[in-house]
Each structure stands twice: as C-alpha cells, then as structure tokens.
Swiss-Prot record:
Entry keyword set: DNA damage, DNA repair, Isomerase, Magnesium, Metal-binding, Phosphoprotein
Name used for this protein in its record: Phosphoacetylglucosamine mutase
Alphabetical GO biological process terms: carbohydrate metabolic process; DNA repair; UDP-N-acetylglucosamine biosynthetic process
Matching InterPro entries: A-D-PHexomutase_a/b/a-I (IPR005844), A-D-PHexomutase_a/b/a-I/II/III (IPR016055), A-D-PHexomutase_C (IPR005843), A-D-PHexomutase_C_sf (IPR036900), AMG1_II (IPR049023), AMG1_III (IPR049022), PAGM (IPR016657)
Natural source organism: Arabidopsis thaliana (Mouse-ear cress)
Pathway terms, separated by semicolons: Nucleotide-sugar biosynthesis; UDP-N-acetyl-alpha-D-glucosamine biosynthesis; N-acetyl-alpha-D-glucosamine 1-phosphate from alpha-D-glucosamine 6-phosphate (route I): step 2/2
Cofactor note: Binds 1 Mg(2+) ion per subunit.
Length: 556
C-alpha cells in the first residue's frame, strides 16, 4: 500500500470518528445498532467491500444499509458477495477488527496487514473495485449510504454506485445477476418475477372447464420497503388480487406492531387488520422484505391468528417440488438427483415428521441463514427455511443444465404437451422465480400463491398439512455461556459432561418430547427449547431443562 493510498484512508477516516464505548460484531445480519452510532462502521465496511471486490478480480460486491425487522431508529450494514450470498465467513474477523479500530492509524495498519495476507494489490495495472450500494426506507439510510460511498472511494480506483431504495433481496439478486453477466436492474428483477409467475400460472392443470376462484390476498408491508415494492410489482401480475396495507405511506411506523417478525413472535394481528378480515388469506413481510409468514383469522372472537410460518412454507414448497420430480421419468440422471430440506433445531418437530413422511432427506444446520444456505447447496435441489420465515430454494447448475436438455429432448420427441414436459417447465420456472441468492418475501409470496392455485387449496387446507406441537422457549442467565458446547446441528450438548444424558432422561417423561440447549451468540444466557404433545408438558419440560442448566452451570 503506497503513501497516496495511506493518505487517502487517513484523510477520509477523519470524517467519521469512531463512537466511544461501542463494540461491534459482524454476524449473520452484518453490523446493527443505533443508527446515530453507525457512520464510522458503514464507512469502514465500504473500505472492506472495495477490498473484497479487488480480491475477487474486481467482481461487483453489494452493500445493503438496513436493520431488517429492528425498530426504525436502528440501522445496519451488510455485504453481498459477488455470488449474491452473504460475505464469506473468512472475512468476518477482519470486518470486526476494522469496525472497532480506535484510530485512523490503527485502521490503516490493519488494512495494510490484511492486504498483504490476502495478496490484494491496488495500482495502475489492476482494474478498480466496483461496489453497488442500496438502502431501505429508514430516514437514516441516506447519510449512512454516503458514508459507505466515501469508504469505497477511499480505496483508489474504486467505484461506488448508488442503486437506490431496495429490498435486501433485490440488492442480492442484482449483484448475483450482474456477476453472471445477466441484466441486473430493478426493472429486470420485476420482469423476472412476473414472467416466471405467469409461466407457472399457465401450467396450472385445468379441472374440466372449471376455473379456480382466486380470493384476494391481504399483504402487511411492515411500513417498509417491501410494501412499496409489491405495489410496484402488482400491476404486472395477472391471476393475483392483492390488497397492500402498512405501506409506510399512511403514517405507520416501520416494524411497530406490524411485520413478519411481530406476527410470528406474538401470533396476533398486525396493525391495520381486524375482524372484517376473518377467513382472508394474509401475508406479512418484514422490514426489508427478506422474511415472509402467512396467517389468517379463524373467527371474530379472538385477536389470535393461525400462523403459517417458515416451516409451513418450506413444507408447501417441498410438496410441490416433490410432485414435479415424481412426474419425471426415472432415467439414470433423475435417479441420482437429490432433493433435500434443511431446518434448524428450532423447527417444529411436527414439520420435520411431515417432511420425513414425504420421503425427503431432512438435515439440520446450525442456527443462522448462512449455515442453512451452505447445507442446502449440497443438494441438486435444496430447500431451507427458518421458522421466522427466512428461506429459499437452491438449484445446482448441473441439475438446471439437465432440465434444459430434458426439455429440449421431450420437445424433439413431440412430447411438448406431456405431463413430464410440464413438470420440467414448472421446475425451470420455479428456479427463475425464487431468489437463489437469499430469502426473498416477494418471490416467496408469488411461489406460495401459484402453488395454492395449482393445488386448488385454501389457506385453511394448507394449514392442515400438520399440526404444530406446542413448544416453549426459555432464556437462562449463566456466568459463562461458553461452558455449553453443542454438536454442529445444535441438537445435543457435548459439554458440560453429563448434561445431555440428564436432558434425555427428562425428555423420556413426555409424549413426543424434544428439547435442546444452546449458548446465545451475544449475551451470557443459555437458550432452552422444548416441545411436547401438550402445552402443559412443553412448559414443564422446558422448566426442567432450565433447572438442569442452572445446576450444571450455576446461575448469574
């Protein structure tokens, strides 16, 4: 790193002094916190993103300014790798180091050492970095984006491009498309969604001459960017009657009593929904539209809702994909293709039982989207979801190539109208509709809606796939959370010695009992999850396991 480059970083970093007493950590959600404290962090992540682009041959990297389902006064920053997925975990320690560097001189020193280790060069013979920056609708987003731009620009030869107000999944999709050499504007994103949705609608089997009556879908936009974007998309969608509430244009506050996180956790109606909506099909997006849950109001005598969470969405997707695969001829390549679903230990046991009953390969991953994504990528078709509504479907390049050849082969044989050809076409359309970079509430809504139309199901019928087992979660404060070590799937405790045997003894006392413990990633607590055939038993099992944690670790 030459003197001109060092001077550039020293000069720009003086604009963004680091706040005192704040320690930040880059997690699954990137950096998050009070927006007033984040300018220096976003500036420094701008530097990191430019270095990441240079490391990967000047591929386009994305920066998203959002705090997802957090309150409106918060904000955050996360990086999209050129693949459209999250920042490589190998770079997360460097993100932590530079975000917490106490002075411009320490920042330069850390950057210099990292560039030497990663063999990153800046100079005339190297093409500059390219970083695309997007933000959600938070008032703090504009000034934070400018800090990110200055950070990118402090690495000589780098270009920062502001691509506007977007959902998080839009930014990831656009970065992925750009690096694959495809059209990558927001309009291209919408065109891709509407075209693949229409294709799937056209492939819905007709039952005689009867047309399926399509009821209206009510969407809770969380007063965020997702509601505004689905408004924009609605005009190009036939076969979908959508009413959007909580768009943020009518004075509602982002994520306050609205949104997927609120509905999933509280299991009550979001603001703007009431007894007039009894029996209606409702969907709720989160603040940056990367999570999706469905719900309906079963009667006008309660504010409680029937929730269809990420587990139910995963089950619907898996059922549909399995149906299409079953329609394909069992040639050698089809037999070898693997469909798998990935869940976390927090997935309701009833959903896991249902998926296994379908004959699917069910695997568990550590909590956190990045861990599920990696596991899902091991399959030809991998479907992953967390109960909170974050998830997607991944198709391997080799399986997509096989689908293309299969479609051509069937057409050449004059079997273009066969059920097998339709199944191949549906799978290809799903691979285009679904956002294979990250979970995307907009593409998720469209896929749920087209599958329900395909099956001729109401939301109540969908909800009957299985009945959730009652569950309970408890946090236990402990002196040292690191004393608990679990398996990689977090389903069993390896340490302290003997605690898992004690947990197993408690589980055996309850019908359909299941329980596990895991240390929190951010605070000195151990999280307890328990489920059983009745709520009373789930509560009792959770309390018993919490007592075991206290007796093995002590309580703080």
């Amino acid at each position: 790193m030459d003197e001109i480059q060092i001077a550039s970083i020293l000069k720009s970093s003086e604009l963004f002094p680091i706040p005192q007493g704040v320690k930040l950590s880059y997690g699954t959600a990137g950096f998050r916190g009070d927006a007033k404290l984040l300018e220096s962090t976003v500036y420094r992540v701008g530097i990191l993103s430019a270095l990441r682009s240079l490391k990967l041959g000047s591929a386009t990297v994305g920066l998203m300014i959002t705090a997802s389902h957090n309150k409106v006064s918060d904000n955050g920053i996360k990086v999209s790798d050129p693949s459209g997925f999250m920042l490589s975990q190998e770079w997360e320690p460097f993100a932590d180091q530079i975000a917490n560097a106490s002075s411009p001189e320490e920042l330069v020193s850390l950057i210099r050492k990292f560039m030497e280790k990663e063999e990153i060069a800046i100079g005339e013979n190297n093409k500059g970095a390219e970083v695309w920056l997007g933000r959600d609708t938070r008032p703090s987003g504009e000034s934070l984006l400018r800090a990110g731009e200055i950070g990118v620009g402090s690495i000589l030869g780098s270009v920062a491009i502001d691509i506007g107000i977007l959902t998080t999944p839009q930014l990831h999709w656009m970065v992925r498309a750009k690096n694959k050499g495809l059209k990558a504007t927001e309009n291209d994103y919408f065109e891709n969604l509407s075209t693949s949705f229409r294709c799937l609608i056209d492939l819905i089997p007709s039952s005689g001459n009867d047309k399926l009556e399509i009821s209206k879908l009510l969407v809770d936009g969380a007063n965020g960017v997702g509601g505004q974007k689905i408004e924009k998309l609605r005009g190009s969608l036939s076969n979908l009657d959508v009413e959007i509430r909580n768009t943020g244009r009518d004075g509602g506050v982002l994520n306050e009593g609205v949104g997927a996180d609120f509905v999933q956790k509280e299991k009550v109606l979001p603001v703007g929904f009431g007894f007039k909506d009894v029996g209606m099909r409702c969907a709720s997006l989160d603040g940056d539209a990367d999570r999706l849950v469905y719900f309906y109001i079963p009667s006008d005598s309660s504010e409680k809702v029937e929730l269809l969470d990420g587990d139910k969405i995963l089950s619907l997707f898996a059922l549909f994909i399995k149906e299409q695969l079953n329609a394909l001829e069992d040639d050698e390549e089809r037999k070898q293709s693997r469909l798998g679903v990935v869940q976390t230990a927090y997935a309701n046991g009833a959903s896991t039982d249902y998926l296994k009953h379908l004959g699917l390969d069910v695997v568990f991953a550590k909590t956190g989207v990045k861990h599920l994504h990696e596991k899902a990528a091991e399959f030809d078709i991998g479907i992953y979801f967390e109960a909170n509504g974050h998830g997607t479907i991944l198709f391997s390049e080799s399986f997509l190539s096989w689908l293309v050849s299969k479609q051509k082969d069937l057409t050449a044989k004059g079997q273009g109208g066969s059920e097998e050809h339709k199944a191949v076409s549906r799978l290809m359309a799903v691979s285009n509709l679904i956002n294979q970079a990250v979970g995307d509430a907009l593409s998720g809504v469209l896929l749920v809606e087209v599958i329900l139309q395909h099956l001729g199901w109401s939301i109540e019928k969908w909800n009957e796939l299985y009945k959730d087992l009652p569950s309970r979660q408890i946090k236990v404060e402990v002196p040292d959370r690191t004393a608990v070590v679990t398996t990689s799937e977090e389903t069993e405790a390896l340490r302290p010695m003997g605690i898992q045997d004690a947990i197993n003894s408690e589980i055996k006392k309850y019908s359909r009992g299941r329980a596990f413990i895991r240390p929190s990633g951010t605070e000195d607590v151990v999280r307890v999850y328990a489920e059983a055939s009745t709520q009373e038993d789930a509560d009792s099992l959770a309390n018993s396991v919490a007592q075991l944690v206290k007796s093995f670790l002590g309580s703080s």
